Amino acid sequence: MENSNNTNIFIIFLSFLMIVLSITSIELPWQRIFLSGKFLGMKIFDLTVDHELFDSGIYYPTRLNEVWIEITSNSINNGIMTCMGINILSLVIILINPFKRFFKFISDSHYLFIEKILIRSLSVMIVIFYILSTTIGLMLSGTYCQVTKSSFDSTDGSTLSDESCYSLDMFSKSHIQDLVIRSTEVSSKPMKGWYLSIVLLFLSLILAVMVFIRFKRISPKLVDLGYRHYLTNNKSSSNNDTGSEVIGLSSNESDNIATVEIEPLL
């Protein structure tokens, strides 16, 4: 019982902490983070213009697709909001447990269903969703466009051709230059969003494990709920009936002892 209470306290603490982190990370500039091309200090996208390579006509990546940046930003924000909602839900369920007797509309079977199915399933689902949204978003956040010197020969800002650019959409020369300038400016600024995101992800994993351990002791069979409730209320009497009851019938002679075994009634 003490371990269960400690687990509940730890889950409540983690839930509050993750709710606070979720609120602070919702408004992070995810588009700027992706434009910086850095992940945990490692440069994953090279958006710096090398004029020597440019003049020689060598292909080099210059483009992050803003469509996927927007999708990724929304995906992460939705993941954070969903994570916060699940944490609040699990927190409410845990806090209601001691006061369950005051809620007449919540029966034991309903509460067992909420604990067993809802909390355990959603705690695992949120971690999977968060990992997928972050991983897929990171994979799709950037599409490289190979640009040659001839692609910039036109000064009217015309779109690039399919032969020189391999991306989901076409874009103009000024658009590329604007992206390069903005990415260079953003790269010089420290970005803490990824660190907060990673911390939130690990806390999600810890919380999911703790919730799974906490509610793993509950039997999934709802049909024996009444029988287990009876055993809980009659624990003191059931301890005496461990398997068989022995009645000793003794006579005046010490070696004349009769024993009778009575099978317990279930």
Curated annotation (Swiss-Prot):
The keyword Manganese does not apply. The keyword Membrane applies. Keywords: Membrane, Transmembrane, Transmembrane helix. It is a multi-pass membrane protein. One of its GO terms (cellular component) is membrane. The chain crosses the membrane at residues 9-29, 79-99, 122-142, 193-213. This is Putative uncharacterized transmembrane protein DDB_G0290203. It is found in: Membrane.
